């Protein structure tokens, strides 16, 4: 058993994302464009593109929007050139934060990220200052009540690295990032649909926040998430209910 409010934290993040669907679409279009540019327009041979397309379909994005983003990425349509940048920093009590961005203006982005950190009690670190505290992996989270033994058998057979039951009853499955699509397909084929499935930077240790500190930490994370150039925010902070 591990973790204590994983389910609540994931549900909060998912609800916040659903509430900003228009912004989610914009982020996904950028991600699809970059994925197609870097790895080609065939999702069968481009795992990153497959993942971003799956996310777009889960977000009910029209297929035409997805195809236009792919065409833009492979050079079939005019569009903005985006650059991938990762920023690292700290929140309250030294909580580690990773901010992944896609931007057409590095100067603007770093200024906005730095401002969000400083305004909400955090500070930016140097490259590599917190990334070592995280593991790059595929992550699946299943609702409390999912049959643990059957899920474990299916996950390990599919190529998962680990299956952990959290204190709240949710079950977390992790796998190598390059195997994410195959493991996801195998789990769904076995009848297991994850509530949340993504390739993430998973914290190796967590820092819990409650009361006023939890509210302050959440404001920092929200401020970073709300920046237009930010694609993903990862943290080892656990916000208690």
Swiss-Prot record:
GO MF? DNA binding
| Keywords annotated in UniProt | Cytoplasm, DNA-binding, Transcription, Transcription regulation
Q: Give the UniProt entry's GO cellular component terms.
A: cytosol
UniProt-annotated location(s): Cytoplasm
Q: What broad class describes the main subcellular location of this protein?
A: cytoplasm
InterPro entries, sorted = Integrase-like_N (IPR017856), TACO1_YebC-like_2nd/3rd_dom (IPR048300), TACO1_YebC_N (IPR049083), Transcrip_reg_TACO1-like (IPR002876), Transcrip_reg_TACO1-like_dom3 (IPR026564), YebC-like (IPR029072)
Q: Which GO terms describe its biological process?
A: regulation of DNA-templated transcription
User: Which NCBIfam families does the entry link to?
Assistant: PRK00110.1, PRK12378.1, YebC/PmpR family DNA-binding transcriptional regulator
What's this protein's family per the entry? Belongs to the TACO1 family.
Recorded protein name is Probable transcriptional regulatory protein RALTA_A0859
Q: What is the lineage of its organism?
A: Bacteria, Pseudomonadati, Pseudomonadota, Betaproteobacteria, Burkholderiales
């Amino acid at each position: 058993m591990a973790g204590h409010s994983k389910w609540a934290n994931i549900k909060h993040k998912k609800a916040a994302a659903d509430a900003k669907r228009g912004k989610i679409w914009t982020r996904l279009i950028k991600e699809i464009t970059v994925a197609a540019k870097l790895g080609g327009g065939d999702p069968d041979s481009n795992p990153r593109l497959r993942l971003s397309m799956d996310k777009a379909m889960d977000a009910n994005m029209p297929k035409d929007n997805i195809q236009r983003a792919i065409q833009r990425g492979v050079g079939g349509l005019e569009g903005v050139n985006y650059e991938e940048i990762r920023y690292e920093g700290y929140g309250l009590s030294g909580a580690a934060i990773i901010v992944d961005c896609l931007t057409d203006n590095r100067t603007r982005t770093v200024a906005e990220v730095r401002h969000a950190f400083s305004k909400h009690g955090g500070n930016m670190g140097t490259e590599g200052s917190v990334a070592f505290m995280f593991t790059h992996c595929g992550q699946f989270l299943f609702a409390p009540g999912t049959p643990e033994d059957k899920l474990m058998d299916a996950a390990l057979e599919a190529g998962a690295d680990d299956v952990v039951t959290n204190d709240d009853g949710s079950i977390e499955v992790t796998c190598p990032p390059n195997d994410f699509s195959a493991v996801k397909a195998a789990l769904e084929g076995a009848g297991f649909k994850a509530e949340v499935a993504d390739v993430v930077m998973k914290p190796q240790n967590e820092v819990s926040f409650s009361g006023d500190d939890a509210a302050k930490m959440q404001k920092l994370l929200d401020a970073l998430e709300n920046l237009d150039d930010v694609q993903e925010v990862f943290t080892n902070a656990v916000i208690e209910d």
